[in-house]
Structures are given as C-alpha cells and as structure tokens.
Amino acid sequence: MKWLVLLGLVAFSECIVKIPLRRLKTMRNVVSGKNMLNNFLKEHAYSLSQISFRGSNLTTHPLRNIKDLVYMGNITIGTPPQEFQVVFDTASSDLWVPSDFCTSPACSTHVRFRHLQSSTFRLTNKTFRITYGSGRMKGVVVHDTVRIGNLVSTDQPFGLSIEEYGFEGRIYDGVLGLNYPNISFSGAIPIFDKLKNQRAISEPVFAFYLSKDEREGSVVMFGGVDHRYYEGELNWVPLIQAGDWSVHMDRISIERKIIACSDGCKALVDTGTSDIVGPRRLVNNIHRLIGAIPRGSEHYVPCSEVNTLPSIVFTINGINYPVPGRAYILKDDRGRCYTTFQENRVSSSTETWYLGDVFLRLYFSVFDRGNDRIGLARAV
C-alpha cells in the first residue's frame, strides 16, 4: 500500500510544471523618492483591472514577487522562443507585450518581441487601444506560439504594443490576462480559453499560491489544484455573474464591528492588484480606526504597534477571512511601516473592493471556469 501511495505521488509530481516567482526591491520605495508613486500605483497596482477601452494534467508555473508590488512569471513567444516577464492578471483578459516596432521610451526599457525572428508569426490588420489610470497603449493583434511552462498554445492571438505612454517605470514586460473572454479589449480569445479548447489542460481551472518569500515559492497552476499549498477545505464562492472574477462580499469588520460593506458589496479577486483597494471614504475610515497617519501618498503606523493592530475581517459567503496587522502593514526601505489599503480613484456606482496580493498571500485561490466560482482556503 505504501508503494502505491509513493507511486501516486511521483506520478502527480511529474504532471506539475512550476514556474517560480521571486521578490525584488520594492518599486514603491524607489518611486516614492521621486514623487511618482501616485502615478505609478494608478498605472500598475490596481488599474490593470480598470480597462476603459474595449487534477491529472496539472501545470504549475512559478512566479516572482517584486517586493509586495507585483508577481511575475516567465513565458515565451514565437519560434524559436523569446522570453518575457509578465503579470498573470485575473482582472483582465488579454496577453500583450512590447513590439519591436514600438518607438516609445517605455518600450525601449523592456524586452520587445522580434517578430521577424519567429517562423510562426502571423500579422493581422486589427488594432486596439487600452487606457489605464494614467497610462495608455496602442497595439496590433497578431498570432504566434505561446508557451507557459510546458503548456503550448499554437496560433495564439495576442497584442503587440506599438505605442506606450506612462509605463516607463514598469518592471514587467507585459500582461497575461486570465479573466473571461467577454471583457477582452482586443477581441482576441484569451490564452486560457485557447489552451482549454486545444485540450492542453484537463480541467478549466487555474489557481494561485502567492508566497511571502522574497525569492521563491509562488506559483500559478493550470488544469487542477495541488492540495499541498493549502490547509483545510476549499470554500467555494459563486461569481456574481459569469464573465468576471467578482463575488458578493457580506461585510468587512474589526472586532465584530462592521466598518465597511455594511449592506453587502462587490469584491474582485485580483492578482494584478498589489494592495486592498476600496472607496476613499471607507479606506480613510479604516486608516482612522487603526491610527494610521497620512504622510505624502501613504499612511503610516509605528512599527512597534504592528503586532497589536486588530485583524480586519472580510466575510465572503458566510466565511470569515481575517487579515492581521502583520499582513496589511509592510515596511519600506527606510524602516517605516505603511498600510496596504489604497483608495480607488475610479468612481463606481456600487461599493467595490479589490482583494489583491495582500489578501491572496494569506489565502490560496482557485478560479474555476467550469463552474463559475472561486475557491479560497488558508495558504500553508
């Protein structure tokens, strides 16, 4: 019996492809010294989700944690393959990287796709535009072979940027969207849907484990769930509607007192967001309740008080998900402790929260396209 269990584990591990993530120096500290943090956060921390213009074959892909700002992983495009660092983003649907014919300064500081060097490249005459918080890009839809670990999507449509503005401080080369196809700004079929249609994955599921480790441990996995990354049972939450990774949140509380989302609200589970983002008035109230003092674009607390701060509890589908002070307070390179609650600068008619990497480092997340639901469990 022991041999059967051992053989099963060996077979299971052979189907897993892990793509590591590592944590680098925080861009928050680098940029804040140049009074550029507000624009940088608008462009990169949570605006990826705010587009204004249109089991058996388990694959795990390692990601790198850029000092609590963003998690990146490597993919390759073309034949022979060219490597790019991309953000795996559950709030957008498209894959795009810089093109070799982009002359914008932002493109010159990143890896650009050299289409003439790929024998499988195919151009289309379709263009697209996308606008972020304070940046914008223009691109063209093309086709080529894209690889995520050992997953291969042939003739995959994706975007090549031909103009980029406001992205000069970006660490990553591009974005790989994992949301539903209906919110694609380019109209191209997302890579996850293409892999599913090509039967490259056994189940229409992907999952994220975001490690606290600066150098390794974080993974995105496709086609199933590796149960070694979480403890207990997965708590499944139905989506508000098929077509977006957003769920109904019951409330947000501190010490059993409701402080936000009092009548229920919308929560987007967003791997492309570094912080927890919500309406300005409610975020300011949280800062007041924990005694955070504004300084520039940040709110700070004495580092000596971090372990005494109350947990902020997010209740989703009747299950409490506490986020302790040591998770929502981070330390910058000057040794100062700042909060990771940020106000949403884009107005919304309904109360909406973005549960970004601060939340997802605590809770393993599963995105189930087959059943239009999200699973959450305590990460190991």
From Swiss-Prot:
Q: Which residues form a coiled coil?
A: none
Task: Give a GO biological-process term.
Answer: proteolysis
Q: Does the keyword Secreted apply?
A: yes
Q: Where is the signal peptide?
A: 1-15
Q: Which PROSITE patterns match?
A: ASP_PROTEASE (PS00141), PEPTIDASE_A1 (PS51767)
Tissue expression pattern = Trophoblast and placental tissue. Produced specifically in the invasive binucleate cells of the placenta. Becomes detectable in maternal serum soon after implantation.
* Highest taxon in the source lineage: Eukaryota
- Alphabetized GO MF terms: aspartic-type endopeptidase activity
- Which residues does the UniProt record annotate as the domain Peptidase A1? 71-377
Q: What class of enzyme is it?
A: hydrolase
Q: What does the sequence similarity comment in the record state about its family?
A: Belongs to the peptidase A1 family.
Q: What is the protein's given name?
A: Pregnancy-associated glycoprotein 1
- From which source organism is this entry? Bos taurus (Bovine)
